[in-house]
Amino acid sequence: MACCRNGILTLTSVVAFLSGGPVGAQDTPLPLARIEGRITVDGRPNEPAWQAIPPLPLTMFAPVFRGTPTQRTEIRVAYDDDHIYAAGWFYDEDPSGIRINSLYRDRWNGDDAFAIYLDPFNDNRNAKWFGTTPAGIRFEQLVSDDGATLNGSWDTFWEARTTITEEGWFAEVRIPFSSLGFQALDGQAVMGLTVTRLVSRLNERVTFPEIDPRFDFRQPSVARDIVLTDVQTTRPLYATPYALTGVEQSPVLATDRTAFITERDVPREVGLDLRYPISSELTFDLSVNTDFAQVEADDQQVNLDRFSLFFPEKRRFFQERSEIFDFIMGSSGGRLFHSRQIGLASGVRVPVLGGARLVGRAGAWDVGLLDMHTESTDGLPSENFGVARVKRGILNPYSSAGAMVTSRMSDGERNHAYGLDANIRMFGDDYLSLRWAQTFDDDERSSIDFMDRSQYYINWARRATRGLSYEASTTRSGSDYAPASGFLPRRDFTTANFISNYFIFTDEHPVFRRVYPGALAFSTFRNSDGVLESGQYAVWVQWDTKAGGGGWIEPKLFREDVQEAFLIGDVVEVPAGRYTFADLQLVLTMASGNRLRANMDARAGSYFDGTRAQIILTPTWNASPHLEIGGDYQFTRLRFDDRNTGADIHLARLRLRAALDARASGNALLQYNSTTDRLAVNFRIRYNFAEGTDLWLVYDETLATERFLNDEGLRDPFSASRAFVLKYSHTFQF
């Protein structure tokens, strides 16, 4: 029997090891109260039905864990046959200090805030975040990979109303079950729940449940399980047709090559988006003649090394539920799928004929299917893009494994890729992440080595924000690995990376909330000869203040082996050779709740065979809740005295956000890049009649700040392109 007992103890230990804690350590699920009586969602939670709901016990999360909140808060959550309700009584001893920095829809901007997080499938990995400010501005996000990924471009149907009095501010929220999706067994659903209140000017946050700061309060794994009984979801069909018109013009050289003439086009487009929940857990989207006219222009960048720049996806159709399609191969390995490959060629829009998407859950599996087709235009062939992604929990509530397949096809050319991945919580805060992928082209030689067409990524990390955290990883990418539907910054390399922090909370200090020294060593080797191609080695001290600011100071050493000369910012050449150089970086940030704030990033030191001095300033002024003025200015001074060359590079960005109220808003983005001598202008005005019904006016223009002479002796036109677009979309619910 002793051997049996030892076997049982060993099995129990293994289960505890894999689950990251003692067996049976989960709290008993909390039965959520059912609303008895009528509630009007008007921001005045004074109905008797609310008083019958017990308030949730709240704990200070920041600035001092388990400290005494300075402002009184009550939060109640309940449900009825069709909705989840939440109400907050956010008392404030200084109502004039309540932060309302912006009325801009879908944007938290350092305001006071109330948020409710729901993990509808109770998988401890994914959640839906619904937040509102004292002005009633709503923002929502999808949380995935246990808080590692936040997607703020997701939109759904729900309500939030607020009021402000001399006592503070008050909120009511109503979330339809149809906007959640959940699994119900015999009419019973178990979800994860977290609620928070933020007093922005004090950087004070309270939460339910109590959450240790070594975790992020947005992690679904720290939510409290709740139980709803006698519930079921509905499955409405949403249809969103749109109509678009406008004027587009661009200069072209006349046939006699003596002058530029203006070509004009008047687009007239209609299209349709359909969304239907096939089940309470699985949603189907169909898009016909997909349009992205209202998308904000890309933030311009200056390439200061020899590897490809990464531009994030800004198109809402692809951002929505994009987390299911994430397959990231570490900081150097790129992505197996990057949706910017669809409908964009070198940043220029390509018409998208349409496509379909299926996302959600089928049993224990997270599922994502995407198929999109682009139109042939300007010498580019029509293309088809396909993606299939599956993922499911394994071993314990905090681990998952999955697979992905992608395809890109055009005119007989095909590229296929597939990959396998796993994220495993080994014990405590330690996780093992594994990724492996392989690509094939139609014309690929059968003699290509297995590893040459493959890429793998192995990462062991302690994901802690208290005490010691660390991350050790390696990535290897073969010379013939080429994901045509993804993003790959460099090819044929192997990395060995390590990074570590030690988080020290300073609860008794009047200024600092935590201080965390750290170090990193990133090394990238060429597979062809094993030589170190790039190396970064650094130590730093970083800090967060109780007021919400922070910063760090970081000396860093670089090693670079350049085989072929390249241009920095398209203006200065770096010759082939081996280089060792170093710099010092200082970053200072101010609390996001300040109406006038600025961040600074400054660095100076040697750079390849010369020197670099750089400063980045990002000021923001919330002049009123109706107007935000923000900007970025990056100045880089490069000098290579031994070669008697250098450059001053300027990148400036001015962004204006204006809102009359929660429905009417405008956005202006002006960007200047000295490496291209271009000024890009983007204006967008939106009127939101109702959720899903919008009118957009968009103006885009690119101006030449330096008009060069061409071969015919003509100066470049002042306006390189101009477009004015009017778009209306309306959502019908059936």
Q: Which residue ranges define each predicted feature?
A:
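N-terminal secretory signal peptides that target proteins for export/translocation
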Residues: 1-5
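Bacterial N-terminal signal peptides
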Residues: 8-19
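Structural preference for beta-rich elements and adjacent junctions enriched in aromatics
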Residues: 25-392, 402
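Short loop/turn motifs that connect adjacent beta-strands in outer-membrane beta-barrel proteins
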Residues: 181-189, 229-237, 276, 281, ...
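Extended, hydrophobic alpha-helical segments in both membrane/secreted and soluble proteins
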Residues: 241, 268-274, 282, 288, ...
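Conserved short loop/turn motifs at secondary-structure junctions
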Residues: 259-260, 271-273, 288-293, 373-376, ...
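Exposed, low-structure sequence patches enriched in small/polar residues
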Residues: 351, 435-734
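Beta-propeller domains
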Residues: 376-391, 395-458, 464
